[in-house]
UniProtKB/Swiss-Prot annotation:
Name of the protein in its database record: Protein translocase subunit SecD
Record note on quaternary structure: Forms a complex with SecF. Part of the essential Sec protein translocation apparatus which comprises SecA, SecYEG and auxiliary proteins SecDF-YajC and YidC.
Gene it is expressed from: secD
Function summary: Part of the Sec protein translocase complex. Interacts with the SecYEG preprotein conducting channel. SecDF uses the proton motive force (PMF) to complete protein translocation after the ATP-dependent function of SecA.
TM ranges: 10-30, 464-484, 488-507, 511-533, 555-575, 582-602
Places the protein is found: Cell inner membrane
Membrane topology: Multi-pass membrane protein
Organism of derivation: Pseudomonas aeruginosa (strain ATCC 15692 / DSM 22644 / CIP 104116 / JCM 14847 / LMG 12228 / 1C / PRS 101 / PAO1)
GO biological process entries: intracellular protein transmembrane transport; protein targeting; protein transport; protein transport by the Sec complex
Family annotation (Pfam families): Sec_GG, SecD-TM1, SecD_1st, SecD_SecF_C, SecDF_P1_head
Superkingdom: Bacteria
Amino acid sequence: MLNKYPLWKYLLILAVLAVGFIYSAPNLYPDDPAVQISGASTALQVTQADVDRAAKALTDAGIAVKADSLSKKGGLIRLVKQDDQLPAKEVVRRTLGDDYVVALNLAQTTPEWLRKLGGSPMKLGLDLSGGVHFLLEVDMDKAVDARLKVYESEVKSLLRKERVRYRSLPIQDRAIQLGFTDSESLDKARSLIAKDFRDFEVVPEERNGLQVLRVALTQAKLAEIREYSIKQNLTTVRNRVNELGVSEPLVQRQGANRIVVELPGVQDTAEAKRILGKTANLEFRLAAEPDALKSATETFEFREPRRPPVPLERGVIITGDQVTDASASFDENGRPQVNIRLDGHGGELMNRATRNNVGRSMAVVFIEQKPVTRYTKQMVDGVEKEVAVPAFKEEKQIISLATIQSPLGNQFRITGLDGPGESSELALLLRAGGLAAPMYFAEERTIGPSLGADNIAKGIDASLWGMLFVSLFIIVIYRFFGVIATVALAFNMVMLVALMSILGATLTLPGIAGIVLTMGMAVDANVLIFSRIREELANGMSVQRAIHEGFNRAFTAILDANLTSLLVGGILYAMGTGPVKGFAVTMSLGIITSMFTAIMVTRAMVNLIFGGRDFKKLWI
């Protein structure tokens, strides 16, 4: 029979729509503005007393508190107004001190039964939630030049060790230049370098009677250095962003040499730039002898709080400036280890310090500039007030203490670690002492929370007006079939929101534009179908046959048009940046949902209403 679906197909469509309604429902529950409290270190746990103290301080400061709670992640205080978030953060930070991290957050109000089903609202982009956007550019040329200088030092150290006489020449065209007065020295140097430095292309040349050895990095090694630099800077930036106490920050790579940092809720760009640009370092020191004088030792805490403090010698062997690489791996027995590489000068210093101290322990001290807030009295508008002044304090902690098994050089390894997790963390900390390459701020943008809320309101208005005008147009043109298309359009919006929520896609202002565009594209499919039905009726077909042929013959055109649009969406996503990607994601998901609602859902409703009935005329 024409225009009839089997029962299973109706049930399948109902099931898909039900899932759509369930997973789009969390977006009906707006998040509460909140401040989140956690310990600055894993050893410090937030207690209910801390939360109560913070809540009381907020109430005393005239900031309305909606509710508070305590979980394994820390304390959460919900506020009534979003504009109170920044003042609340300052009050709580001042009340609890620098031992606690106070972060701006948005607390979900989704009912428990929806959360158990995995339902959560869409994430909002920076243009809708407010915050700071930075685009950092990594100077890759400086990264290559710095690594080349390290290799130059190592090559010269090798030649001096093997007593090969050479003349030092300046680096030229990304290549180390070495001059020799005789071919015998050149050949010996070439053989030594080729043996110990496999990542170099060694080419002999002759210039003005001087024999020159040109030592250049291979293209593969250059690519490896650039990749390492961007990854290392990405890791360091992530570590520094964590100190800002921001809920759900975004730190991701963009292109070959750029890093995007988005900090929702942050309005103080100066503080964010200070944190991102701050420095950390490392020190390698020998553990103090039991009979050492107190004046010659210094005691340090471990980064791991369960271990007791250890006295170390005041003399520093090398610093993190000499560490060129650190990576986690496994030894020949499958045990975790950390491989460390030093520059030429660092290797000499390390060898000098360890060759007579085999059997003693050596510690790696991590030095970090921690942000603290101090309060000073200042005159503000003729009134003396306490004003927060951001500052940094130096914190030194031991991250590794290992026994020296043999004299060390510019390459050595740390073993005796508890597991691969500890080796990975140690390697990360050894690399986090600084940036692998200089960075500068290529772009900076601040979006206030009120502007974000205004963008949301305007986006909702645009979507509603768009849906209203599209619905009126299609109802006027196609009458009762226009009503069916409008219902399908509403289902399409529900399905699109549900799909974005399930996938965890971020909704941005261009994404809202994609939603409005999706409405027109969804109705476009209905227009093709209904126009085809009109044509078949005009050609003298019966009502049932016209409906059947209208849907079937329009399908190919709809599929071709939507596949072409999906291809464009894919290209936009692959080639575009943040805002363009947001638009591409929403548009592409909207195309998928519109094909389902315009073809399957609309057909199901038409079949239920008109299928199997003897209609002489259609309201189309």
